[in-house]
């Protein structure tokens, strides 16, 4: 890759992570992504180990799809979803009211500085968020701090090592009406997936933050990786 292309990718990655982009474009992304990875949300909700009447944290909740899936799967728990985009928080709360879910709430928050006391939560989840964090280690150590001992963490992210075949299939399902498929593929390959985590890198990042019994799997239904670990 030449220097010009590398500069463009770095520039687009910075734009990708800006709060204003998610304030403006979040609703479009929400509509486009839901059906593509809905099964992933449900799988995580079922896989998450949640004690009775526990508090669960969703970091980077977006419109709240995963938070509501966890709330439905664990009806005696209370899920708190945070996002650094206030418009995403408002969209999530609106969606929660539409779905009439009482054991879930949303608030603005920053993964770099979680505004919760130590050992507040008994489980935590995050999907598609960590690649946007300015310091993934700091964010993961913040999650570790607010979890009780013995708590479960599940985090999923786009797979940096996804094959061209898997990514092409993803493009076919994740349509953006105003973006040609070839440009969409390039953007996903170099800006979204290419600036994300491999399975090994994500597992190592979670372990480096102090989590134990780290297990990492690729997802058969979409080119994501999942890490499950314990505090």
Where are these regions (language model features)?
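Conserved class I S-adenosyl-L-methionine
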Residues: 1-50, 65-69
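C-terminal lobe and adjacent flexible extensions of AdoMet/dcAdoMet transferase-like proteins
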Residues: 226-231
């Amino acid at each position: 890759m030449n220097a010009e292309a590398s500069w463009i990718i770095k520039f687009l990655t910075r734009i990708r992570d800006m709060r204003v982009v998610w304030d403006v474009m979040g609703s479009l992304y929400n509509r486009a992504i839901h059906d593509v990875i809905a099964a992933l949300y449900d799988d995580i909700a079922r896989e998450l180990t949640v004690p009775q009447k526990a508090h669960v944290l969703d970091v980077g909740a977006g419109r709240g799809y995963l938070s509501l899936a966890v709330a439905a799967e664990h009806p005696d728990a209370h899920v708190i979803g945070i996002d650094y985009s206030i418009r995403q928080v408002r969209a999530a709360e609106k969606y929660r009211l539409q779905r009439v879910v009482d054991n879930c709430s949303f608030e603005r928050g920053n993964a770099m500085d979680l505004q919760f006391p130590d050992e507040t939560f008994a489980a935590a989840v995050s999907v598609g968020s960590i690649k946007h964090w300015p310091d993934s280690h700091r964010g993961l150590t913040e999650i570790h701090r607010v979890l009780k001992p013995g708590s479960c963490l599940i985090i999923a992210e786009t797979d940096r090592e996804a094959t061209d075949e898997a990514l092409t299939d993803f493009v076919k399902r994740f349509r953006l009406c105003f973006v040609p498929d070839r440009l969409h593929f390039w953007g996903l390959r170099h800006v979204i997936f290419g600036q994300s985590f491999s399975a090994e890198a994500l597992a190592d990042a979670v372990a480096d933050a102090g989590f134990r019994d780290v297990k990492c799997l690729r997802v058969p239904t979409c080119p994501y990786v999942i890490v499950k670990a314990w505090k």
